[in-house]
């Protein structure tokens, strides 16, 4: 960063990635009872986004989008039938994809992934095959284990593995301790790389169901166990930021906190809230793909600001590579753009468009404040899709809850968005699915 930013050199990068965290689950985003003092402070010292999007509304494609800067359909990490990787899956993030970790490692960064991976659990797809020097965590979701469900299919899964590098070091780890163990591993990595530029990716397992909190947090929130879980995540963020302060790395480290998608609404009190946004996980409504996001970099990102600029997890690859002085891949389409102008000035704007995919199909698109829906569903699973002919249209600045369809009043806006979508589809090349499980024919 230069000019308006004070740090010059190769910064460190930390991505803290919650799992199924709702847009309305943090104190700084308006939750009335969940206490998040560390995230609140992070926002007060940094930049809070009100319109930040993930690349998909479920786990696997969202993670692929974040690490590659590309829509998941371009890498084969999106599928209409099997929407995430399961223990029987044979695929994963292709070796040809370039991750943030690979690009930064190529210019001397130390790299670590600590937490839930969910981009392929066979050796050729693990973090160590995608640019990470170190890995500690579980390779897929914490509910994909016989101990979490009595379902017949789940009972065929192996015990949940906890891995270090490419080795399983435990089976069925105590999930009450996952957040704490990820935090401790993260702190160790940071302290081991005080003199090296580093990239730390911390994809937490929580608050994906089944939810667990450690003894120190269980029963401490008035929101119940879900609140306990979020307050422990907040503690974890505080621990990571504190070690950066203690080591003097805070002024040379760009930290971003966000989520893979918004809340799983059908699991009752075990899930969160999307606040004023409509619906949640698994859908292309705002409540599924707009996520709480805070950027922090003392003395470089101006403190205490809120931006309405559109941001995306896919922006992180070009942003971080640009800040580190690494070349962007020139042999492929990137869907993310550099967010540095917004980090410097919350009034700045970068690419103001969003494509909302469900699986490998485009269900909605946003241009500026306008969002057009072709198809909608009201839940992750269990309901039927609704076709919109003509497409439904919402003005998200005036109607962020997507309650008032104004398509009949805005035919020209529909035409403009359709032209944008047509151009997108014309250039898009979808890769073969990595997620399909042929033996699952039911």
Residue ranges: model-predicted function:
Residues 1-392, 400-442:
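Formylglycine-dependent sulfatase
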């Amino acid at each position: 960063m230069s000019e308006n930013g004070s740090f010059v050199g190769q910064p460190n990068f930390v991505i803290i990635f919650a799992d199924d965290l709702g847009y309305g689950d943090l104190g700084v985003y308006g939750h009335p009872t969940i206490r998040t003092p560390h995230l609140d402070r992070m926002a007060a010292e940094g930049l809070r986004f009100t319109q930040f999007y993930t690349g998909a509304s479920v786990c696997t494609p969202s993670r692929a989008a974040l690490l590659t800067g590309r829509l998941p359909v371009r890498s084969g990490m999106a599928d209409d039938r099997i929407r995430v990787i399961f223990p029987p899956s044979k695929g994963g993030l292709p070796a040809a994809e370039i991750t943030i970790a690979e690009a930064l490692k190529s210019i001397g960064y130390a790299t670590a992934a600590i937490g839930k991976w969910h981009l392929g659990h066979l050796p050729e797809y693990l973090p160590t095959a995608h640019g990470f020097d170190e890995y500690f965590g579980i390779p897929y979701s914490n509910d994909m284990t016989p101990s979490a469900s009595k379902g017949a299919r789940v009972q065929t899964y192996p015990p949940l593995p906890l891995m270090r590098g490419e080795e399983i070091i435990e089976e069925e780890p105590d999930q009450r301790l996952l957040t704490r163990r990820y935090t401790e591993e993260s702190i160790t990595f940071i302290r081991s790389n005080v003199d090296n530029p580093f990239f730390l990716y911390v994809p937490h397992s929580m608050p994906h169901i089944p939810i667990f909190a450690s003894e120190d947090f269980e029963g401490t929130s008035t929101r119940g166990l879900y609140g306990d879980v979020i307050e422990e995540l907040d503690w974890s963020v505080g621990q990571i930021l504190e070690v950066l302060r203690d080591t003097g790395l805070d002024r040379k480290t760009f930290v971003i906190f966000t989520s893979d998608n918004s809340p799983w609404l059908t699991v009752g009190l075990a899930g969160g809230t999307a606040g004023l946004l409509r619906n949640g996980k698994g859908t292309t409504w705002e409540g599924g793909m707009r996520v709480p996001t805070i950027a922090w970099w003392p003395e470089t990102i101006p403190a205490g600001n809120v931006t309405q600029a559109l941001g995306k997890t896919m922006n992180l690859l070009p942003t971080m590579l640009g800040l580190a002085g690494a070349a962007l891949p020139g042999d492929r389409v990137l869907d993310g753009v550099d967010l540095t102008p917004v980090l410097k000035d919350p009034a700045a704007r970068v690419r103001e468009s969003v494509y909302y995919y469900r699986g490998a199909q485009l269900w909605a698109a946003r241009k500026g404040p306008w969002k057009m829906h072709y198809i909608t569903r009201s839940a992750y699973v269990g309901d039927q899709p609704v076709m919109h002919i003509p497409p439904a249209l919402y003005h998200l600045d005036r109607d962020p809850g997507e309650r008032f369809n104004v398509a009949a009043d805005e035919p020209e806006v529909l035409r403009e968005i359709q032209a944008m979508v047509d151009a997108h589809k014309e250039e898009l090349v979808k890769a073969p699915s990595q997620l399909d499980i042929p033996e699952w024919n039911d």
